[in-house]
């Protein structure tokens, strides 16, 4: 009887391990301030990104993919929670000393943990809880990555005297290694370039995780190519030395530096023979800032025209995702939570999300989604700042701080008051404002926007 019991336990445990290992690994690589037109595979003629281009050639490229905000923190809230950031009263950058995302909400790592996943966050956080005082007294302070469900994290300490000073003095990427924390422990100084540290740590995590039967989720949030524009490496700068200089040269090098890291990460997956069981997503948190390119789209970071929120998105998973595909399915960063849950075969209580499961699109089983109206809001302080305008941009004054988008129709509003209406199917570059010609559409969408803005939401995140 005892032997029978042991055999049954062994069979059960073997089945459990097999079911865990059959779940796909998931890697999300998020660039910072990378424009729609900053990758060769999205039309860039000025920056070379051969490894990311290869991802697109071997996978699926989205042409109408949106960040859930035109600035940093709100998009990150949308990614982790699968909900519009305004539901948490987040419409601007966090003051990391006093603001934070509450840890009572479901996040991607929490959801995946129920399916046996181990997880790690690497890189920029910007969701509160990573000041030195928070790290050293977590029980009496605000939540950080561990409290939001990650098993491990590596990030730069976000105190202004570290991050803020390094950015102002244009040495963020050079000096970030002096101010790192891992799993709520402050680390010794590391002299490597910040982008190299992140990709090295990502590869280290992947190698370690691949030795177990446990699927993994890697959340790799880069700082690059966000300003300050700094030296990357000679190889990354080499293609541009003859035709570029100064800040523009540094920016191009930073994007190619990202591409180098992505290439090494993909090579690692192939060398470990886990590439066919690993979903890799590459995207950006918002449109480009000063030197990046929105391609032909109007606007850039902080602006709710297309250039500020339409971003690159590439999905790669050999055999599961067909090679060299493009899709114009309208999608959003809030879709990651339900999509990753679907790939992980997550079951249980119904998940509250504004996102949609993109798995059928990724697997080539659907080329449309019956998507309800999507909504955005940004603080008017950022919308009207004009910090990222260049001479080629055409912006209204003041700039719209809200969007309602349904299929081809996009309404821009200021505090609920409609200001612009575009048919993106016929006018993706937003040249012809149809507000006066299509008042019935504008009125209908304005009512939907008002209902969303008036819906209950969490108290402010502090």
Predicted feature locations:
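Conserved, charged catalytic cores of large soluble enzymes
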Residues: 422
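Formylglycine-dependent sulfatase
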Residues: 2, 18-415, 419, 428-462
């Amino acid at each position: 009887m005892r032997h029978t019991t042991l055999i049954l336990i062994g069979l059960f445990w073997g089945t459990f391990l097999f079911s865990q290992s059959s779940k796909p690994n998931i890697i999300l690589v998020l660039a910072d301030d990378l424009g729609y037109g900053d990758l060769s595979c999205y039309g860039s003629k000025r920056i070379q990104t051969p490894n990311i281009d290869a991802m697109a050639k071997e996978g699926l490229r989205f042409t109408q993919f949106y960040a859930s905000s035109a600035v940093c923190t709100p998009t990150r809230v949308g990614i982790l929670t699968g909900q519009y950031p305004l539901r948490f009263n987040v419409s601007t950058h966090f003051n990391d000393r006093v603001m934070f995302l509450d840890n009572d909400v479901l996040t991607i790592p929490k959801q995946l943990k129920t399916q046996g996943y181990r997880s790690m966050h690497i890189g920029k956080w910007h969701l509160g809880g990573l000041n030195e005082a928070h790290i050293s007294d977590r029980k009496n302070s605000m939540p950080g990555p561990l409290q939001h469900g990650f098993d491990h994290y590596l990030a730069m300490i976000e105190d202004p005297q570290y991050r803020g000073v390094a950015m102002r003095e244009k040495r963020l990427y050079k000096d970030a290694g002096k101010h790192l924390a891992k799993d709520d422990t402050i680390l010794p100084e590391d002299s490597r370039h910040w982008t190299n540290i992140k990709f090295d740590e990502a590869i280290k995590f992947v190698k370690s995780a691949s030795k177990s039967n446990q699927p993994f989720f890697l959340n790799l949030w880069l700082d690059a190519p966000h300003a300050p524009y700094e030296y990357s490496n000679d190889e990354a700068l080499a293609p541009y030395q003859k035709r570029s200089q100064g800040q523009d040269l540094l920016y191009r090098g930073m994007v190619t530096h990202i591409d180098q890291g992505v290439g090494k990460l993909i090579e690692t997956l192939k060398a470990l023979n886990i590439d066919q069981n690993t979903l890799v997503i590459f995207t950006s948190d918002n449109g480009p800032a000063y030197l990046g390119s929105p391609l032909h789209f109007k606007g850039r970071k902080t602006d709710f025209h297309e250039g500020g929120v339409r971003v690159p998105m590439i999905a790669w998973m050999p055999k599961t995702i067909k090679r060299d595909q493009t899709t114009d399915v309208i999608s959003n960063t809030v879709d990651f939570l339900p999509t990753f849950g679907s790939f992980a075969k997550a079951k249980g209580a119904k998940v509250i999300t504004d996102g949609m499961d993109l798995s059928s699109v990724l697997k080539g089983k659907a080329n449309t989604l019956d998507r309800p109206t999507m909504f955005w809001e940004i603080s008017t302080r950022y919308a009207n700042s004009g910090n990222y305008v260049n001479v080629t941009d055409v912006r209204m004054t003041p700039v719209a701080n809200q969007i309602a988008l349904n299929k081809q129709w996009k309404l821009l509003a200021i505090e609920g008051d409609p200001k612009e209406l575009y048919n993106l199917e016929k006018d993706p570059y937003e040249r012809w404002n149809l507000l006066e010609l299509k008042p019935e559409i504008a009125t209908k969408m304005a009512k939907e926007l008002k209902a969303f803005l008036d819906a209950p939401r969490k108290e402010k995140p502090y």
